[in-house]
Amino acid sequence: MRPALAVGLVFAGCCSNVIFLELLARKHPGCGNIVTFAQFLFIAVEGFLFEADLGRKPPAIPIRYYAIMVTMFFTVSVVNNYALNLNIAMPLHMIFRSGSLIANMILGIIILKKRYSIFKYTSIALVSVGIFICTFMSAKQVTSQSSLSENDGFQAFVWWLLGIGALTFALLMSARMGLFQETLYKRFGKHSKEALFYNHALPLPGFVFLASDIYDHAVLFNKSELYEIPVIGVTLPIMWFYLLMNIITQYVCIRGVFILTTECASLTVTLVVTLRKFVSLIFSILYFQNPFTLWHWLGTLFVFIGTLMYTEVWNNLGTTKSEPQKDSKKN
């Protein structure tokens, strides 16, 4: 029952989280900092109450290691959300972040001296080609949609290039954080709930440097039209409602992934998360009518197939099917 519940939480929480993030970004593209701050604050408070036991429970992993991880995590979160302010459409944002496999493999080879099979290199090549196709086609759309004048088109393209640079940086930093996390878990054991709390609580002072931007967007949120929440009948500015729902769905999404990692094999977790990204992407295209050409679909297909190949889903499904047959023959 718990694995089924976890899958339900991942799909419901993560997919709806993307919807509310897009609703926020469409109205105020530069609202990434206030969204990141609200998410971090909520998870930090929840973790302080239920995981850290109001600060009485000492951490299993020394704080100095969390400080390194937190610096990377904070940077990745802020840069990823800020990229939406740099002419990056939500579908491209989702596709580009699916390139985490490429970043993990590159850094795994360079830092951990890992070696992979030809099959995995092929899958990574597919993911790379898929991301390149989607990125290239999005670049053409940015210049054509902003062609009020040649100067405007060029300026929009430069901002878009900065957005791609930001996403690439966040992708590599995220992969480096994953490798660092892996070495910590090998040394101190897995403490994912504790890591979740410290990764969100320790960076909170860093938002002081973003306070001006957060305040400006809070003022803009206050000026948005009023919205009455169904059932409870409370009225509040609609942007605050979107932010509240984004925080709640983010928490549901994270809890779902956490339950999934404790109940299922890592292969299942990867497959569920990949399928969730694919569903979110399709919903974003259909519901928000984001521009998506045949080339974008081809690129997305390459990314999806490459990800499934990397996780060796078909091989593992084949093994699991053959095991019951062997058992029945023995009986």
Swiss-Prot record:
Function, as annotated: Antiporter that transports nucleotide sugars across the endoplasmic reticulum (ER) membrane in exchange for another nucleotide sugar. May couple UDP-alpha-D-glucuronate (UDP-GlcA) or UDP-alpha-D-xylose (UDP-Xyl) efflux to UDP-alpha-D-glucuronate (UDP-GlcA) influx into the ER lumen, which in turn stimulates glucuronidation and excretion of endobiotics and xenobiotics.
Gene label: SLC35B4
Placement of sequence motif Mediates endoplasmic reticulum retention: 326-331
GO CC terms: endoplasmic reticulum membrane; Golgi membrane
UniProt membrane topology term: Multi-pass membrane protein
A biological process from GO: regulation of gluconeogenesis
Main subcellular localisation: endoplasmic reticulum
Family the UniProt entry places it in: Belongs to the nucleotide-sugar transporter family. SLC35B subfamily.
Regions crossing the membrane: 4-24, 30-50, 59-79, 92-112, 117-137, 153-173, 201-221, 229-249, 251-267, 268-288, 291-311
Pfam families, alphabetized: UAA (PF08449)
Compartment(s) of residence: Endoplasmic reticulum membrane
GO molecular function terms noted in the UniProt entry: UDP-N-acetylglucosamine transmembrane transporter activity; UDP-xylose transmembrane transporter activity
Highest taxon of the lineage: Eukaryota
Protein name per UniProt: Nucleotide sugar transporter SLC35B4
Keywords in alphabetical order: Endoplasmic reticulum, Membrane, Sugar transport, Transmembrane, Transmembrane helix, Transport
Catalyses which reaction(s): UDP-N-acetyl-alpha-D-glucosamine(in) + UDP-alpha-D-glucuronate(out) = UDP-N-acetyl-alpha-D-glucosamine(out) + UDP-alpha-D-glucuronate(in); UDP-alpha-D-xylose(in) + UDP-alpha-D-glucuronate(out) = UDP-alpha-D-xylose(out) + UDP-alpha-D-glucuronate(in)
Record keyword Transmembrane helix present: yes
